[in-house]
Structures are given as C-alpha cells and as structure tokens.
C-alpha cells in the first residue's frame, strides 16, 4: 500500500454509552470505523473490529451499526449498544438476507430477523421497515459519513503534521502518488 493510506489512521475517545467510561474508536480520517475498545477493570476490551465487507458506523446515541456481507445472497445488519461498564456489547436488532428461494423460474430473496438467537423468516416489507428504523445509511462509505455527521467523534491523527508532510513528500518523490 502507498504511504498515504497509513497516514489516514487515527482515533477518537468518547463515552459512547454515557456510563462514564470512555471508549477508544480506531478510525480513518474519513471516519471509517476500524475497531472499538472499552476499558474494564483497567484493561482494554475489544468490542468489535471491522473491515470492508463487514463495516460499522456509530450514530448519535453511541449505538454501533454493523453491515456485513457473506456474498451476493447473504447480508447482515445489526445494531448494538455498549453495556454499562463497557465490558461487552448488547444486540438491539439483527436482520438481513439469507439466500434465495426458487419458485419456478423466479428467485425470491429470503429475509430474516434474529429472535432469541434464531433466524426467523420475515417478509420483504418487514425487512425494509427494520432497515428504515435501524440502518438508514447502508454501505461502507455512507456509514463512515454517518459516523462523521452524527457520532460527535473528533478524529485525532496518529501522525503529526510534519510526519504527514514528510511521508507525502517522500511518496511524491518515489512516484507512489501523483500531484
């Protein structure tokens, strides 16, 4: 990867659930959430880590919204809140798509919601109602934009301005990035 990718790494510190314990959010400068940590008994606790096909965003309540994909036929949307004390996250809702069902020559998407740990079939309209209620911002970049606009997180770069300038300058000299 080129040097400008690592320069976008940073963090934010905020009490996401209002329990008096700050969480550490690792994220990029465009607010793509990479990982969320809390502290319990003086030790860091990883609450979640995320990547391109399994992304997350944080809303104004401090809730964590995950969007994942296991391929074209399967998707998952989940919403969590951080438990008081920060030791874990609690599932508020999970729903998604679970493959297709063929009836004749037509494939129909199968929708589900999680109830007591089990995937329960739901209708398309129920799926879209859950989607509207919990995940209005689908997709990796839309989620990052939602985190930026609604979470009240403040990005802090891992690098100083001088380090960023030097890395960018060296990358230009090596022809790794164009200006």
Residue ranges of predicted features:
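A glycine-rich, hydrophobic loop/mini-helix early in the fold
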Residues: 3, 7-10, 22
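Loop/turn residues immediately N-terminal
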Residues: 30-35, 74-77
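Blade-edge motifs of beta-propeller repeat domains
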Residues: 1-5, 43-55, 179
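Beta-propeller blade termini
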Residues: 7-16, 54-63
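Acidic/hydrophobic-patterned starts of short beta strands in beta-sheet-rich repeat architectures
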Residues: 17-28, 62-67
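Acidic, small-residue rich beta-repeat scaffolds with periodic aromatic anchors
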Residues: 67-179
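Beta-propeller blade repeat segments, especially FG-GAP/WD-type strand-to-loop junctions
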Residues: 33-48, 82
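Extracytoplasmic/secretory soluble proteins
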Residues: 36-38, 57-59, 96-100
């Amino acid at each position: 990867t080129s040097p400008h990718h690592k320069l976008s790494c940073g963090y934010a510190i905020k009490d996401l659930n209002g329990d008096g314990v700050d969480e550490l959010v690792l994220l990029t400068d465009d607010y793509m959430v990479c990982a969320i940590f809390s502290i319990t008994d003086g030790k860091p606790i990883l609450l979640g880590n995320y990547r391109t096909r399994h992304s997350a965003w944080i809303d104004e309540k401090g809730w964590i919204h995950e969007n994942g994909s296991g391929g074209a036929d399967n998707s998952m949307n989940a919403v969590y809140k951080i438990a008081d004390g920060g030791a874990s996250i609690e599932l508020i809702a999970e729903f998604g798509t679970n493959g297709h069902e063929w009836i004749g020559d037509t494939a129909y998407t199968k929708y589900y919601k999680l109830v007591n740990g089990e995937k329960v079939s739901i209708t398309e309209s129920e799926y879209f109602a859950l989607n509207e209620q919990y995940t209005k911002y689908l997709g990796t970049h839309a989620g990052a934009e939602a985190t930026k606009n609604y979470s009240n997180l403040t990005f802090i770069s891992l690098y100083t301005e001088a380090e960023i300038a030097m890395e960018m300058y060296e990358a230009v000299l090596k022809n790794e990035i164009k200006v």
